[in-house]
Amino acid sequence: MKPLAIPANHGVMGQQEKHSLPADFTKLHLTDSLHPQVTHVSSSHSGCSITSDSGSSSLSDIYQATESEAGDMDLSGLPETAVDSEDDDDEEDIERASDPLMSRDIVRDCLEKDPIDRTDDDIEQLLEFMHQLPAFANMTMSVRRELCAVMVFAVVERAGTIVLNDGEELDSWSVILNGSVEVTYPDGKAEILCMGNSFGVSPTMDKEYMKGVMRTKVDDCQFVCIAQQDYCRILNQVEKNMQKVEEEGEIVMVKEHRELDRTGTRKGHIVIKGTSERLTMHLVEEHSVVDPTFIEDFLLTYRTFLCSPMEVGKKLLEWFNDPSLRDKVTRVVLLWVNNHFNDFEGDPAMTRFLEEFENNLEREKMGGHLRLLNIACAAKAKRRLMTLTKPAREAPLPFILLGGSEKGFGIFVDSVDSASKATEAGLKRGDQILEVNGQNFENIQLSKAMEILRNNTHLSITVKTNLFVFKELLTRLSEEKRNGAPHLPKIGDIKKASRYSIPDLAVDVEQVIGLEKVNKKSKANTVGGRNKLKKILDKTRISILPQKPYNDIGIGQSQDDSIVGLRQTKHIPTALPVSGTLSSSNPDLLQSHHRILDFSATPDLPDQVLRVFKADQQSRYIMISKDTTAKEVVVQAIREFAVTATPDQYSLCEVSVTPEGVIKQRRLPDQLSKLADRIQLSGRYYLKNNMETETLCSDEDAQELLRESQISLLQLSTVEVATQLSMRNFELFRNIEPTEYIDDLFKLKSKTSCANLKTFEEVINQETFWVASEILRETNQLKRMKIIKHFIKIALHCRECKNFNSMFAIISGLNLAPVARLRTTWEKLPNKYEKLFQDLQDLFDPSRNMAKYRNVLNSQNLQPPIIPLFPVIKKDLTFLHEGNDSKVDGLVNFEKLRMIAKEIRHVGRMASVNMDPALMFRTRKKKWRSLGSLSQGSTNATVLDVAQTGGHKKRVRRSSFLNAKKLYEDAQMARKVKQYLSNLELEMDEESLQTLSLQCEPATNTLPKNPTDKKPVKSETSPVAPRAGLQPKAQPQPQPPQPPHKLNQGLQVPAVSLYPSRKKVPVKDLPPFGINSPQALKKILSLSEEGSLERHRRPAEDTISNTSSQLSSPPTSPQSSPRKGYTLAPSGTVDNFSDSGHSEISSRSSIVSNSSFDSLPVSLPDERRQRPSVSIVETSLASGRLERRPAVEPDQYSLGSCAPLSESRGLYAAATVISSPSTEELSQDQGDRASLDAADSGRGSWTSCSSGSHDNIQTIQHQRSWETLPFGHTHFDYPGDAAGLWASSSHMDQIMFPDHSAKYSRQSQSRESLDQAQSRASWASSTGYWGEDSEGDTGTIKRRGGKDVSLDADSSSMTAVTAEEAKPAAMAAHIAVTPSAAKGLIARKEGRYREPPPTPPGYVGIPITDFPEAHPHPARKPPDYTVALQRSRMLARPAEPPAPGSARPAPRPQWHRPGDGDPRAGPCAPPGLTAEEDEDEQVSAV
């Protein structure tokens, strides 16, 4: 890192962007723009270090929904169903919603400790947090660890505080953890450093001096500082720790010496980088205790630097011939097969490699290893479906079969004709046939199997490679030939042995093997099989698997969590108890990060129910298991119906009714199984007498069946919908191969083309639009409300299933603009569901890199199965990839690959569960009160009960205590849900959804007619009509039409924070950072102590500060500014913004929003004393008009300044800057938790917070009003209309207001060139503070302590200072809002306000700037003709430009003194100012 003393390159900021993300990374969703903005991670989880641009999209925050006074509504008009009765609601205790979803901010606790008091765990916490920041990029883990051990924490509380003066001696190297600072150079250039950037000394003891003046730009800037001496020592020590391996004078590998703790027991060398050949060779070298996962990491990531896996395969075969390397080579191959069997399947060269390796093992008499290899192949092989056709039934089969249930085996292929179609289809020796034409072949006699295969000309065959069992079968057959007697298998009925218990290691293998029972009485044989397998494992384990190097790592994790210097546990304990002799720290054969078990073999316990009818329409409920055949059902049905005939006279028939009303009837084959899964809703099973031709189902019954098959969402159980969603999502999630993440991340071509990953990726969009489609297609308002309520319940149950993906999708769907604008529908939602919804949203608060969600995900009691939020996974991986170079000094950067592999392993563990997926998410009829806090795992879920016992739970036959009819009804509900989900018709076009939304609730007029008119305002052209506070009086004022070339103008919006300061010692009384100050480095230490003391006294003072600093979100969110090289693209029209008397601002950015553009409002606290303020209303052609509207009289104004405002969350950077805020009313009890509180914010955008962006657009957060408020505190005494005002998106236009006229002149400033340093490609960075610097003699009325300070009104023009004119003391500032289409009028409502959704990170939108200004964007539509006509009548009269006034810097008043009230305490009119005087004031907006 270069020091600040060198102006050309300041820390990381000097690095130019290398490459922006490929657009297809963000295919998940459409938002308003493509932003190549750099986002930096600030959570304690994601593990990324970023130095280049990422394209993950912005996401509006999930704000807090407020309650309205309207209580629960009367639902009597809507018939209640059993699913959604109010009684049910009372049973389901929703009061748990008050349980907050917060935990202590562990990272801050660690930072505030004295460095000498930090434990190893503290350093691990800090390391995981810090190593994602760009300042630490390309540092080795040991250097980061050392820096974390000595860093001190400092907080500068006030914006505008001088941190370093020009020429001051530097004494430390510092990294910004929160907030941003601005460096103003003597030549007038300015640069903004944001979260993750560094400044200060270089790693040398030479004296260095600050160049320029550094000031904080926002309140509550947080830094960590490392003293110069420590910084120099640590960085210079790196070379000493490096060990370079040279060959022929060239460096081929670099290792680093690491100590993982202070005990000195865990230390050694770890590979940092190397050539591909040398890394391959390292596979069979000795690995130190600090690098135990090298083989795994290599086998996952070799594809990024090697062209073909055979490069590794050939080397392994070659090394196998060396007896000293043989065991190591075998272990590598076993791990490869176990972890990435997909590298072998479908690749002929790799299949031949595997066969050759097997032959080598046989040749060397390594039988135990060979068995383990076969076990691994059987465990990892996937089912394959192939179709064969025979020319005639008599035609011979092209293959020979062995096995059969009479021998205790399945059906296996012994040989295949080489020239047959079966070979072309992929059938090969050793394949086990699992199913033919829907009939189960896993437990069938060989003769019966041959009969089925011969009697069909069209064969649909499901097979799976199972070499281990096939070889066991061959051994048995040879023994039989020798001994002359059939040999009963020792490995018996595994299904009955261990299905409902957590098996030990041997039984795991047993389940994998899939051996079948000989007959129904062979349960006792299991023990012999288990013992035999244990012997197999015992023989081979020691020679293959290394001994456990240390004992303090949990079973559920690989050693890599500790090795690379990250935390030792990811808090995902595994449910697999491992036998004591197996190294639990190695992800070896039976502990893959993905599933090991094959769940195709299910229990024989009768846990399913069929309803079987007779021709006279009597019915009985029959308990069956999944493998019960049709013939067995007939036997049971005859017994239930008390029929005296023999089973041979009857058969099972399926009768179904098509949607057209056609009745179909077919006889089921005797061997057909999975009967409960096959029956349709519009079908029934009948017991049919084979000798009669009676009609089984009459027309009346058929019509009834057809009616029953028509399903609506409200008829479905919310628990069952959540369960089925979770089962479906989990199946998709666990099918993702680890290699797919790598292929997708590095854009590698693979034979599977990441199909599983893409499928799972699409789910979140489909579920989001499902929610919107379902709600908007319902025309009845009461039913619409009930559907919303239904979805909130489903989301809650998804949380219980740990299905965060669906939970997030449902919340996002409810917040899509077309749904969010349905004000009257939302008003009818009961308050308790408001609170529930708010609680669910709170989990996905994007601040601090989604700290709340990550805390829940990593909590101790959250165990697999977990379905994580996929966009966050993808973002984390992308940042690791984009933020670290793949090659360093010509060598493969293996440190980067190790971090990526560790992240993928962590994700994979969420899917590693040793349980049938069908049982995982079963939480039938669980009361909500038992769900616990949202921040806790559901310890009463079935899988967790089993997992936590670590042993065998007592099995209970469910049929002994569960009513068959009740079971059937539950199963029928599951069938209904499955059919409903499979037949969904989604409306994925947001324009169509908007049309449906307007049909549900048409847009209303934008302007109320009088002050008492409380009619909610909606924009006819806005897709979002937010629910906000009451609509105050608005007086239209004329505005001249804007010329077409002015369409790219933005709003000038001042920003003010409602966040309470941590005032203890006035920061300005403290000396600057550097040596020149009396206290030198002590200054920052005193800041640190001040912040620390503050925390202990804070709870008594204010709740916001308490919640924010001690809980999961830090005091301020990561805010940042874009890199050099970007400019703002022009946008079409100007958004309006308006402030309401007691409304709070929230950005309303929908997930998909080519039509959902909103406007940028001023944010004010909830108070009733009002004063005039400015509202600018957009028009269709960017002609605006000013409204005068009674607004709150605050001590501080809050401003909708895009990213700076913590709540102004819809900020999009770079290509197009789109802000979509809106207003919401705060209820009194929520005032203290107001979202402008910086603690939980940083919500400029999803990525700015979720990824800790340091390139997020941010300018002013938590400024004092004088620093940020050019209007709202600038007044003139003109009783007439105020003129409109606009500013360009890059620079301020000159806007001047004379004393008694509404005339104005504006002059557009030309943009600075891209290569100018001060123009950091964004309006956020090329600005200073307009309000504070331009306030000279401008005729503004300044208030201090309630007194008006009048200046000369004649000179009341405010001139913008361009960046060229800006000086360190007078830096021009503005906040330009590049609006979207003419679609964003702020609307208001009485009562509650629903917040918009988070747009998931990684979603890209249609970039508006892809189209020239002259042509309309295809995704935008003009306002309705009537609206345009109405607005055209509001055009202003022409104005003459007055003489420009000069802008001079003015002293910056200290608005908040220690005696001032809390900024959140609500605005009050200054003493002595009456309400009448208030009303008479005119506000000039500049």
UniProtKB/Swiss-Prot annotation:
Domain of life: Eukaryota
Residues found modified as Phosphothreonine: T644
Modifications the protein undergoes after translation, according to the UniProt entry: Ubiquitinated by NEDD4, leading to proteasomal degradation. Phosphorylation by PLK2 promotes its activity.
Entry's localization field: Cytoplasm; Cytoplasm, Perinuclear region; Cell membrane; Late endosome
Composition-biased stretches (Polar residues): 1244-1254, 1304-1328
Domain PDZ: 385-468
Stretch list, region Disordered: 40-59, 68-101, 1002-1049, 1090-1176, 1221-1254, 1303-1357, 1391-1486
Keywords of the record: Cell junction, Cell membrane, Cytoplasm, Developmental protein, Differentiation, Endosome, GTPase activation, Guanine-nucleotide releasing factor, Membrane, Neurogenesis, Phosphoprotein, Ubl conjugation
Domain Ras-GEF as annotated: residue spans: 717-944
Pfam families (alphabetical): PDZ, RA, RasGEF, RasGEF_N
Binding site for a nucleoside 3',5'-cyclic phosphate: 135-252
Residue span(s) of domain N-terminal Ras-GEF: 267-380
Function statement: Functions as a guanine nucleotide exchange factor (GEF), which activates Rap and Ras family of small GTPases by exchanging bound GDP for free GTP in a cAMP-dependent manner. Serves as a link between cell surface receptors and Rap/Ras GTPases in intracellular signaling cascades. Also acts as an effector for Rap1 by direct association with Rap1-GTP thereby leading to the amplification of Rap1-mediated signaling. Shows weak activity on HRAS. It is controversial whether RAPGEF2 binds cAMP and cGMP or not.
Subunit structure: Found in a complex, at least composed of KIDINS220, MAGI2, NTRK1 and RAPGEF2; the complex is mainly formed at late endosomes in a neuronal growth factor (NGF)-dependent manner. Interacts (via C-terminal domain) with NEDD4 (via WW domains); this interaction leads to ubiquitination and degradation via the proteasome pathway in a cAMP-independent manner. Interacts with MAGI1 (via PDZ domain). Interacts with ADRB1 (via C-terminal PDZ motif); the interaction is direct. Interacts (via Ras-associating domain) with RAP1A (via GTP-bound active form).
Protein name per Swiss-Prot or TrEMBL: Rap guanine nucleotide exchange factor 2
Organism annotation: Bos taurus
